[in-house]
Amino acid sequence: MNTFVNFNANPKNKLGCDCVVRAISTAMREDWITVYRELCDLGAELYDMPFNKDVFGEYLKRKGWIWHPCKSENGKRPKVCNFDKANSAILRVANHLVYVSNHEYYDTWDCGIKSVYGYWTKLN
């Protein structure tokens, strides 16, 4: 079982609309503004918004992360609170990203009941 950790990587402690930057910067141990700027640059390169899944998916791929879709078992997908497929991962749930590491998920709100559509792990 994973435990919720109330954590906000946003340097101004703002809430909302930046889960992509928060999850990625926390997972990569990069500062929020660096990740935000790099996503914006890639968004401009791809002519798309930086928080679009195609943009952040490409960003993670270029940074050495691998996408793993979560297949439903018996019609159900794993929940954030019981995700156990990787020790450290960025999880994609409905309209949201969250970082999980060592049985803790880091976010500004408890998204533990959300179903996991897929996740990224760092290629070693």
Segments (PLM) and residue ranges:
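Active-site nucleophile-adjacent alpha helix/oxyanion-hole segment immediately C-terminal to the catalytic cysteine
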Residues: 1-48, 53-64
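Conserved active-site-adjacent core of cysteine acyl-enzyme catalytic domains
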Residues: 42-95, 101-110, 115-117, 121-123
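Short intrinsically disordered terminal tails
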Residues: 1, 123-124
